[in-house]
C-alpha cells in the first residue's frame, strides 16, 4: 500500500470517528492519544533504521468522557470528565508487539488533580489495567492538572499534564509521506477503537522518575483514537 493509499484509509477511519459517536456498549468511553520516540506512521526503511535505537519511550493518555469503574468494596466510581496519563520507558523499541516487546518497563502515572481520593485510586487502577505490562512497574504517581482534548472532525489533539507532559498532534497529510510506503506500521500501545496515525507537533516529557526526559517535535509518531472498555 502506498503512502497516498494509506492516507485514504486514514480518511475513511476519520469519517468513522466523526459519524459514530461513543456507543453505550462499554462501561468507560472516551478519547485516547499516544506518542512514541520512534515513527509509527512509516515504512520498513525508517522502522528498520530505528529498531533498537529509538522508540523506547512513550506517552499514553486517556480522557474518560463518560462512565464509571467497579472498584470492589468502594463500588462504582464515576470517572466522567477525568483524565490520566502514563509515561513509560522500556529496555527495547516498542515495536510490533508494543509493550510486550521489551524485557523491562518502568512507568510514571499522572492523575487528574480534580479527582477526589476514590477517583484518583480508580484512575491509577484504570491506567494500570489498560496499559498492560506498562502498568506493572509504577515508580511514581503524581496528581497534576490535565487538559486533554481531541477534535474528531479535524483530528487535532492536545494533552497538557502539569509541567511534565505536553503532546500536540495532527492527522498525517500527503506531504508527510517520504518513501510512499507509509502505513500504521506499529499498532497502538493500548486497545482502542478507530485509531488514526498522526504527526506529533510537540511531544515532550519533562518529569521525574524515569531517569530520562525527551522531546520529539515534528515526528510521525502519534495515534489518536476513541476507547470503549
Where are these regions (language model features)?
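N-terminal Sec/ER secretory leader and immediately downstream segment
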Residues: 26-109
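Extended, charged low-complexity segments
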Residues: 172-229
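Mature extracellular/secreted ectodomains of secretory-pathway proteins
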Residues: 73-196
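Bacterial N-terminal signal peptides
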Residues: 9-19
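Bacterial N-terminal signal peptides that target proteins for export
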Residues: 1-10
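Sec/Tat signal peptide C-region and signal peptidase I cleavage site
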Residues: 20-26
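Processing junctions and N-termini across compartments
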Residues: 19, 32, 39, 171-173
Amino acid at each position: 500500500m502506498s503512502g497516498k493509499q494509506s492516507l485514504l484509509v486514514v480518511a475513511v477511519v476519520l469519517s468513522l470517528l466523526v459519524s459514530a459517536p461513543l456507543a453505550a456498549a462499554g462501561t468507560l468511553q472516551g478519547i485516547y492519544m499516544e506518542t512514541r520516540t520512534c515513527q509509527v506512521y512509516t515504512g520498513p526503511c525508517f522502522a528498520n533504521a530505528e529498531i533498537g535505537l529509538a522508540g523506547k519511550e512513550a506517552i499514553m493518555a486517556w480522557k474518560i468522557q463518560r462512565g464509571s469503574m467497579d472498584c470492589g468494596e468502594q463500588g462504582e466510581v464515576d470517572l466522567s470528565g477525568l483524565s490520566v496519563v502514563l509515561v513509560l520507558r522500556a529496555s527495547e523499541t516498542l515495536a510490533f508487539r508494543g509493550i510486550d516487546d521489551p524485557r523491562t518497563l518502568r512507568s510514571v502515572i499522572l492523575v487528574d488533580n480534580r479527582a477526589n481520593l476514590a477517583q484518583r485510586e480508580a484512575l491509577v487502577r484504570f491506567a494500570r489495567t489498560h496499559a498492560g505490562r506498562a502498568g506493572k512497574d509504577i515508580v511514581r504517581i503524581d496528581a497534576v492538572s490535565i487538559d486533554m482534548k481531541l477534535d474528531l472532525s479535524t483530528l487535532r489533539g492536545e494533552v497538557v499534564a502539569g509541567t511534565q507532559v505536553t503532546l500536540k498532534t495532527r492527522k498525517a497529510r500527503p506531504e508527510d509521506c517520504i518513501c510512499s510506503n507509509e502505513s500504521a506500521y506499529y499498532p497502538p500501545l493500548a486497545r482502542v477503537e478507530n485509531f488514526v496515525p498522526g504527526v506529533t507537533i510537540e511531544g515532550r516529557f519533562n518529569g521525574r522518575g524515569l531517569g530520562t526526559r525527551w522531546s520529539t517535535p515534528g515526528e510521525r509518531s502519534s495515534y489518536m483514537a476513541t476507547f470503549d472498555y
